[in-house]
Amino acid sequence: MPSHKSFRTKQKLAKAARQNRPIPQWIRLRTGNTVHYNMKRRHWRRTKLNI
């Protein structure tokens, strides 16, 4: 990844960084909740973004 990125590439990386976080703990406490963890977590070395 070059240090001089296009704006579109930087936007995609920022979106991927926002998505790659655990769910908040208060969501797990809601009544009738079935979400236990974020299934779409991505590890930087195992799975690449292909951008």
Swiss-Prot record:
<dbReference type="InterPro" id="IPR023626">
    <property type="entry name" value="Ribosomal_eL39_dom_sf"/>
</dbReference>
<keyword id="KW-0963">Cytoplasm</keyword>
<feature type="region of interest" description="Disordered">
    <location>
        <begin position="1"/>
        <end position="21"/>
    </location>
</feature>
<dbReference type="Pfam" id="PF00832">
    <property type="entry name" value="Ribosomal_L39"/>
</dbReference>
<protein>
    <recommendedName>
        <fullName>Large ribosomal subunit protein eL39</fullName>
    </recommendedName>
</protein>
<dbReference type="GO" id="GO:0002181">
    <property type="term" value="P:cytoplasmic translation"/>
</dbReference>
<keyword id="KW-0689">Ribosomal protein</keyword>
<feature type="compositionally biased region" description="Basic residues">
    <location>
        <begin position="1"/>
        <end position="15"/>
    </location>
</feature>
<keyword id="KW-0687">Ribonucleoprotein</keyword>
<dbReference type="GO" id="GO:0030684">
    <property type="term" value="C:preribosome"/>
</dbReference>
<dbReference type="GO" id="GO:0022625">
    <property type="term" value="C:cytosolic large ribosomal subunit"/>
</dbReference>
<comment type="subunit">
    <text>Component of the large ribosomal subunit (LSU). Mature yeast ribosomes consist of a small (40S) and a large (60S) subunit. The 40S small subunit contains 1 molecule of ribosomal RNA (18S rRNA) and at least 33 different proteins. The large 60S subunit contains 3 rRNA molecules (25S, 5.8S and 5S rRNA) and at least 46 different proteins. eL39 interacts with yih1.</text>
</comment>
<dbReference type="InterPro" id="IPR020083">
    <property type="entry name" value="Ribosomal_eL39_CS"/>
</dbReference>
<dbReference type="GO" id="GO:0003735">
    <property type="term" value="F:structural constituent of ribosome"/>
</dbReference>
<comment type="function">
    <text>Component of the ribosome, a large ribonucleoprotein complex responsible for the synthesis of proteins in the cell. The small ribosomal subunit (SSU) binds messenger RNAs (mRNAs) and translates the encoded message by selecting cognate aminoacyl-transfer RNA (tRNA) molecules. The large subunit (LSU) contains the ribosomal catalytic site termed the peptidyl transferase center (PTC), which catalyzes the formation of peptide bonds, thereby polymerizing the amino acids delivered by tRNAs into a polypeptide chain.</text>
</comment>
<dbReference type="InterPro" id="IPR000077">
    <property type="entry name" value="Ribosomal_eL39"/>
</dbReference>
<comment type="similarity">
    <text>Belongs to the eukaryotic ribosomal protein eL39 family.</text>
</comment>
